[in-house]
Amino acid sequence: MNAPAKFSTSQIRSDFLAFFEGKGHTIVPSAPLVPGNDPTLLFTNSGMVQFKDVFLGAEKRSYVRAADVQRCLRAGGKHNDLDSVGYTARHHTFFEMLGNWSFGDYFKKDAIAWAWELLTQVWKLPADRLLVTVYHTDEEAFELWRDMIGIPESRIVRIGDNKGAPYASDNFWQMADTGPCGPCTEIFFDHGDHIAGGPPGSPDEDGDRFIEIWNLVFMQFDRQPDGTLVPLPAPCVDTGMGLERLAAILQHVHTNYEIDVFQALIGKASALTGIADLENKSLRVIADHIRACSFLIVDGVLPSNEGRGYVLRRIIRRALRHGWMLGVRQLFFSKMVPTLVELMGEAYPELVVAQETVARALLAEEERFAETLDAGMKIFDDVASRSQEIIPGADAFRLYDTYGFPVDLTADIARERGMRVDMEGFEFAMERQRETARAAGKFGGGVALPADLVATMAPTVFLGYEAQDADALKVVALLKQGRPVDRAEAGDEVIVFTDRTPFYAESGGQVGDSGQLSGTDVSIEVADTQKFAGQFHGHVGRIAEGALKLGDVLSGGIDVQRRGKTILNHSATHLLHAALREVLGTHVQQKGSLVAPDRLRFDFSHFQPITAEELAVIERKVNAEVRTNHSVEVHNMAMQEALDFGAMALFGEKYGERVRVLKMGGYSTELCGGTHVSRTGDIGLFKITSEGGVSSGVRRIEAVTGQGALDYVAEEERRLGEAANLLGGNSTEIVDKVRALTDRQKRLERELESLKAKLASGATADLGASAVDVAGVKVIAVRLEGFDAKALREAMDRLKQQLGDSVIVLAGAAGGKVALVAGVNGGPTGKVKAGELLGHIASQIGGKGGGRPDLAQGGGEDGPALATALQGVPSWVKQHLG
């Protein structure tokens, strides 16, 4: 029998797409690893994610047949293969899924025929090495395989409900407990009887002999709440085939790590680490993880301590730790990127575009972790030496919290030593920290609307996009001291809920409105407006006069000036976000914001400090868009329509079926429920006041706008003028004058150091003569006025050269503090230790210190005790000399 043809991974990709394009399919680009239409999903983990809304009927596409190669990630949440990566033949964090789709067009007959044609005619797989499974009641699929394709019944395996419930089967797919579902048929490749394992459905099915290569799902039912299956009017097809495991078969190897892509990456890792054994598991881990990390960064994820960014950090640090295990102490991981681009850049041009960003982000994380890895490993070794089989959860949390060791990294290390981590203890420590954080961040001491009250209320109607005041606002709920009441009196602190309101409730970073509510006999000063249960506007304030009761009808007006300043800052954050992405790269994503009347604060993902030059460019670009005076357009549309419109959605924000889109010319388009200017020119002026780091991978810019920006510039000019006056010149001369001052300061400091050295030299000449002989050893213990630690050390060196065998203690006093230096030279070092001597002296003057046997340093408080301590040195030395 002739061996099947051999295909490269790139060829397999292009063959698949070309084949289905020839069958009338639209070729759809891979969706990002970060799902754009499902904020509840951590990562794209299958090919069907981008088509989910199509299958659910919530979205229509311009085609009914599609094919794609989808990049996927399984390293967090429900689908997490991280612990297995590197230790098994086929587990990966990142993988590619080949898929073809029918949305109410072709069904089982064509799907099965085309799958067989591609496998056996294009890729030349021997038909007698292929085996298929079908759902045990799917007679149609069984007959198609037997009669149309011609597979013997002995190689068609019926799989029943093998997971303990009706339709709970490896061969029955369902999206959820209800909704679209249906049987599937799977195609397996037989590696041969020289490999252990049995066919699917047998007791030995978990062996490696029979490998699933293609799953064809036939969505033909709508599962009802009572469990019954109702036929769908337009059945669909969803297929998935793992590229890596298919490549292993078509390249005549047994494990995925032996295919061309992985062999090239493992070879690069081998060259960087100096490890020649290409089957080394750590090299496999590094090769796998560079793909996952790089494509996550391509799709806008950066290392951080939460969410997707934390998963990325875990993967990076796992790879770095495996490099450390191989003895690598230099930076290496980011150097894998060019090889990856060579291998996958043609299939994914976005990887080529983002190559520099990827390498810089990985290098920054590599440098950061290198600082703590050594220290963290020492802590782990210490904990492991004190533990038997279990690493205590509290210690695992300390490694995570202090040294940045993700718990699965700690578990990985523990497993290699035959140990495990107490995960319950770790989760307890983690939850305790979360509770502390939640308690610190709760508004109003954790005030919440009772569930029974929420059930009786309709969502607040917000009038504030069009109006700044309104009448006929009915009081529908009233809280006093966090509890529902029917009535409140003058002086009471309350939270008032009305059916409608012009007051904006804090959300999306924008602070809530303040203002006034009033009725016939009542006036309420509103200090803030907060959103409760995501849909009710609570007016937080104090009853100034009168009494308020449920059912009262009020008029309300916001603080117009405060809102006016706030909207300038909110609109500016949109322009800033766009400018950051333009200047720094599309990896920049909003991580948080504060939009207040007096300033704006914008947190965003970026892996290094922003240079002064970059800040200047960003500021100029924002002000250019302000001067362009774009009209700010508001569009209300369906979520998918908004995404197609180009609007940016922020992960973590909750969006309804319809969303509000803010468009500022062609520069910025974002989903936003906040209040904004009518034209960008209303912002007036944008001025950055500060930039800095918030946490690893997150930067913060603060800025002011409008009159606040003008006031800021005026204050800066005033300070500049004041500085110029102090320097005796005008503002244009400040730089030259400051430079001259710093040059003069450096010159004077050098002269001062020279004078101190001369003083020390002269002092030592005199001190040598005052040495006391103790058992043949010269002992000096003196106080020197004005000597700092450096001058004391220089004096110590000269005295050692001058005296030979000696014990020397020098105390430099200045400003109520004492610097101590103790030295032991020559013969006495065997019995007299400088560290012990200095500790003895420092303890008498309220200080501390230590060092080597021949030299120690410390300090303490100046006072009478110093003289006593120095006088006692000769007797202490005599005692230790014996």
From Swiss-Prot:
Its cofactor is Zn(2+). Zn(2+) binds at H570, H574, C672, H676. Keywords: Aminoacyl-tRNA synthetase, ATP-binding, Cytoplasm, Ligase, Metal-binding, Nucleotide-binding, Protein biosynthesis, RNA-binding, tRNA-binding, Zinc. It catalyses: tRNA(Ala) + L-alanine + ATP = L-alanyl-tRNA(Ala) + AMP + diphosphate. It holds the Pfam family tRNA_SAD. It comes from the Bacteria. Coiled coil: none annotated. One of its GO terms (molecular function) is aminoacyl-tRNA deacylase activity. It is an enzyme of class 6 (ligase). Belongs to the class-II aminoacyl-tRNA synthetase family. Catalyzes the attachment of alanine to tRNA(Ala) in a two-step reaction: alanine is first activated by ATP to form Ala-AMP and then transferred to the acceptor end of tRNA(Ala). Also edits incorrectly charged Ser-tRNA(Ala) and Gly-tRNA(Ala) via its editing domain. Consists of three domains; the N-terminal catalytic domain, the editing domain and the C-terminal C-Ala domain. The editing domain removes incorrectly charged amino acids, while the C-Ala domain, along with tRNA(Ala), serves as a bridge to cooperatively bring together the editing and aminoacylation centers thus stimulating deacylation of misacylated tRNAs. This is Alanine--tRNA ligase.
